[in-house]
Every structure is written in C-alpha cells, then in structure tokens.
Amino acid sequence: MSRNTQSESGISSLQAKAEQTVFYYPPKVYSSERGNEVLYFAPDQQVVVVVNLAGQDVLKAAEEGGTADEIALRLSRGDRELGGGIQQLVRPFLDEMVKRRFLSKEPFANEREGRPSPERASLELSNLYLHLTDACNLHCVYCYNACQRTENIAQRRSGAKGIRELSDEEIREVLDDAAEEGIGTVVFTGGEPLLRNHIFNLADYAREKGISASLLTNGTLIDREKAVRIADLFDNVIVSLDSWIEAEYATLRPGAPLHQVWDGVRHLSEAGVQSLAIRPVVTSLNLASLPDFPSIAKEQLNCTRFYPAVYLPNSPGELETLGLFPDPETYWSTLASFFKALDEVDGTSVKDECKLSGAGACGAATSLLSISASGDVYPCQSLHLDEFWAGNVRKQSLGEILQDSPALKAFRENRWPWFKPCSECSLMAICSSTCRVFQNVFEKRQDLFFQQMCPFFKRECEHRLWREVDKIRLQFVSSGTPLSRG
C-alpha cells in the first residue's frame, strides 16, 4: 500500500468518525430575540452566545441532539426551501458552538436538582455596613428601615435597656474585629451618618486599622469644611439624590430643599473626593427626568458617576398603594437612554457586568454583613429582622458571631429561592429576585410577586445579558445564505 493510499485511508477514517460525532444540547436554556439576533443563555454552563436567525434554526434542530447529518436533515424537513451545501454550513457552526461551550460532544451532566450546595455560599467577608445612628433628617417615602429606626428611637427615649446606640469606644472595638476578620471596607450609614458625633474620628480610626471607609449620605449636611474632611477620610462617597427637579425631590425625599443637597455634592466635588457618586432611587415619578441627569450633574456639580437603583417595595401593600414601582419596559428603555447620556459626558456607573452564576450574586452573610446602631448583627442592611438576627457585638466579638451564629450559618446554607417557579426558571442563577429580601417580603403574596415583580426582574436579566453581547457576539451566516430566513 502506497503512502498516499495510507494517508487517504487515515483521512477517510477521521472523516467517518467526525460524521458520527453526536452534538448534545444543554439541559436548561433561556433565549431572547432582538431584531435579527437571538441570545442563548445556558446557566449550568455559564455561557452566553448570540446568533442570527439562521443560527437559531440550527440550534432548534439541535435541541434533540444528534450528528451533524441528523441535525441537517431536520433542517431540510422544515417549511422553507433550503439550498445545497447544508452539511458544509451546519458542521462548522456546531463545532463553533462546542468551542463556545454551548453545545457539547459529551452528554451533559444531569441538570442540577433542587438547591445550590452550601459550598457555593462560602464566607468571603469583605464589606461591613455600620449604622452609626438611627436618626435622620429626611422622611423618604420609600425608606426601607424607617419603621425600625423610629421604634428604636422611641425605645431609647423611654429608657429601654440594650437599645442605646453603640458608643465611640464600642465602634472602635467593632472596627478592631473587622480588621482581624479581613474586612476591607466599612460603609458608614444610618439613618444619616453625618448626624453622628465624632464620625470623622471613627473614619480616621478605620483607616488606621487598614480599612477603607465609605460614606452613604443624603448630602444635606455637607458644608465646605465638612467636605474637606470627608475627602481626606473616605475613599468612596455615595450621595442619595433622586432628581434634579425640585418638585420630584421634595415629593420623594421631604425634609430638606433640593439646593441643600445640591450644594453638598458641589462642595464634595470641589474638595476632590476620590470617588464621588450620585445614587438616584428610580421610581415611576422621576423616571422620565433620569436621562437629563448626567449632563446637568456634569455642568452644575462636576459629578459624572452614577449608581442608579430602582425603587423596590418594602411590602405587598406598599406596591399597591404607593404606585412608585416603574413599568418594566418603560424603565429599561429609559435606562438605556440614561446610559447613552452618561456616555456622552464621559460618565461612569456601577459595573453591571453579568455574573453568570451564583444564585443572583447576593452577598448577604457571605461577602457582607450589617450592624445596627445598637450593635445587632444581620446578614444584610435590608434584613434587619428578628428572624435573621445573628447576635450583638456588645455580647460577642464579631469573629465569634461569624463562627457561632446559627442564623448566619443557616442563611449561608439555604441560599435557594423559596418560590418554586423561581427554582425552575432558567434565569435563576443571575436573577436579583432570588435576593432573600424579596422572597421574605412577598412570601405570603406570591401571586402579586409573579404578576408585577417577576416581569421586571426578567427584563433586568435580559438587559444584563444583552449588554454582554459585544463580548461574545457570534454571527452565523449573512442574510443571503441558504439557512437564513430571508
């Protein structure tokens, strides 16, 4: 046998083997169409791919699995006239999808059933929310902890024991513990943290312990002198400022005029704060004015960093009575206009890169903790509730609470949705609705949750996935090829 004959025989053998290669489709997939493109998300594989309509045809034919010939045959049985060379078009596409890890040449492992394992919620504590005081000079209509703060203040005035705010010395002890536990950032919050006496001394102490200090403030109490101190002590400052329109601000955050916080932000900018950001809570009331905010903030405040946060109801009743929750489609289309306007002024925003795994990427009890003004420890600043109480720093060190608290351990080991439809959804891995706050608020009104909240979170997931498109874009064939829809 000649060398050419042997070579040809080897090639034929490889070709025959390739022809018998079986392609497997992921067990769980979410798809979203936009114009002539289709996005596919495989959560178990943590993969996103984008194809055109012809690619969608091939993937539909591949759902049952099979060889390239079998998949091409399913295509040819479709309701369209297909040109020749189907095999030549299909096989390279399938191979590319394997390369992208969307398809596989080996059977996928059985779909993960039930709940994520506790290991997925391992402790990597990095952020501590430290509530310096329950006092606040504003009366925001949507405040998530107003009732608790008001109750705590009333109990202190009545002389109730154990409810007093932590002293400066006790806060220093907390900061000592935080440093020992490797916590890198402490967020000074409240109430309004600038109402706390000696806040600057406490921030300075945190820096001495090697901890980065951040400030979350409503901005109404900042004059030029305070702005300079803040710039010296805090690495990050976030100012809650919902609107540049007086009437909107007054309705959402009564208690101080808009110009007061406007001046505060300007003072911070002039003082040279290292990282200064505006956080508007976006509601149905101020949504329409949001796209104009970046240019106005740059011109008048020299601030172009924004952390927009959508208003989320604190109870089912609030969802029905306040009417502040925005329409999902209107919200996301307006947010797109906002980001475009932000780009035009060279602004920046909180990174919304899509984390493709991690049960919604909630950091409660794992990467963050929260301590109330009276020393109670909770898994999250939005979960200061009795059922999630982990201990008190007056009775135990922070390290002891982290190690011994049944509440924190249970929270970390039970990071799965309480709502059955959520656990069956292909978007669960990236969906914000798996946050325990929402599951807790709507536990007894799941009907309302799935009617009004679920569509919003679904649209959010799609928004985040599509923002990944430029990184993972995969165009199958141009519109003139035999497999296109024409």
Write out the residue ranges for each language-model feature.
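Conserved alpha-helical substructure of the radical SAM core
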Residues: E81-G84, Q88-E96, R100-S104, A109-R229, ...
